[in-house]
């Protein structure tokens, strides 16, 4: 036994420790999709797995999204794993031509793909934008994206846009996607892209109008609300929407912290901001408030629901907004 141990120690001193085996798989953190009905180009950001860290971009093209992903898998230097996917970025050209539900359905067939990833749309070149996707110092890219998504949603400047949530909407609610852009400091998620009844991108809401949308969705509270003329700090909010055959009423209750504005002034300015956003939604044919979920209960069957032509009814609705404001105690 002692002789065997001595021989083992001699081997270690003479030959040293062997190198660790290289990574057998690469975790895809961001997927970018560009192209249209004739051709699709996909790009992924993966770690370099080098000692100094960093990320690299792999790309591939195909006739369809599925073909492009297969080409990417076969050409990758190691097996790709989708369990750490945090962000799916679609070019505006792609999102305006390919329905979002079709894109997400195709992606849901990818093995181990993380459908809790957020979905965004960009007007910028996806190849250039990919290089902007780098983590904050000392963090992983996946962690940086998680922190940004949470912070920006709490501020109300991006909508809830997880792929798994959007897939559940069906024909009862229109998906709203967040905006993606490059900045001098790197990468930013901001604003909301509206989709129509066919799931195609139609219009963009800037951050301040995205806040109003989230307020009407009941998702905005305890943050600064940027109204057209003033900014107020919300301390409490509640929202309800009532739908009849050809009218809809949005009721908003809010408490705010700003002593120099009267409740009447806050209510009037908030109501007008809501009406402006509702007009944008109607013009885009976007049911971001989920009125379809309410209307479907009046249908006797799915055939009756399809025959009701709810998208046309949505665009002809007459809206009333009632806002009740109270200063915080």
What role is predicted for each listed range?
Residues 7, 11-329:
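Membrane-proximal alpha-helical signals and transmembrane carboxylates
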Residues 1-5:
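Bacterial N-terminal signal peptides that target proteins for export
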């Amino acid at each position: 036994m002692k002789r065997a141990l001595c021989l083992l120690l001699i081997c270690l001193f003479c030959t040293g420790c062997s190198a660790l085996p290289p990574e057998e798989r690469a975790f895809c953190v961001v997927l970018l999709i560009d192209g249209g009905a004739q051709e699709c180009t996909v790009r992924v950001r993966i770690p370099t797995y080098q000692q100094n860290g960093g990320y690299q971009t792999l790309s591939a093209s195909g006739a369809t999204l599925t073909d492009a992903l297969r080409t990417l898998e076969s050409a990758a230097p190691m097996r790709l794993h989708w369990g750490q996917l945090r962000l799916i970025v679609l070019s505006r050209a792609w999102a305006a031509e390919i329905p979002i539900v079709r894109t997400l359905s195709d992606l849901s067939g990818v093995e181990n793909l993380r459908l809790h990833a957020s979905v965004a749309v960009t007007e910028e070149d996806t190849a250039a934008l990919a290089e902007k996707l780098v983590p904050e110092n000392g963090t992983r890219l996946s962690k940086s994206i998680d922190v940004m998504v949470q912070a920006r949603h709490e501020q109300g400047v991006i909508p809830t846009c997880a792929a798994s949530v959007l897939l559940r909407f069906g024909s009862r609610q229109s998906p709203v996607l967040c905006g993606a852009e490059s900045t001098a400091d790197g990468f930013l998620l901001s604003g909301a892209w509206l989709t129509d009844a066919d799931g195609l991108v139609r219009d963009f809401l800037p951050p301040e109008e995205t806040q109003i949308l989230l307020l009407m969705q009941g998702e905005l509270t305890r943050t600064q609300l940027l109204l057209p003329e003033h900014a107020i700090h919300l301390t409490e909010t509640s929202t309800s929407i009532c739908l009849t055959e050809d009218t809809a009423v949005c009721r908003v209750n809010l408490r705010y912290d700003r002593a120099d504005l009267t409740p009447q002034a806050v209510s009037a300015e908030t109501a007008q901001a809501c009406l402006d956003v509702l007009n944008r939604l109607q013009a885009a044919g976007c049911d971001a408030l989920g009125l379809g979920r309410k209307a479907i209960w009046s249908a006797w069957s799915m055939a009756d629901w399809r025959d009701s032509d709810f998208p046309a009814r949505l665009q002809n609705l007459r809206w009333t907004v009632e806002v009740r404001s109270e200063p915080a105690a």
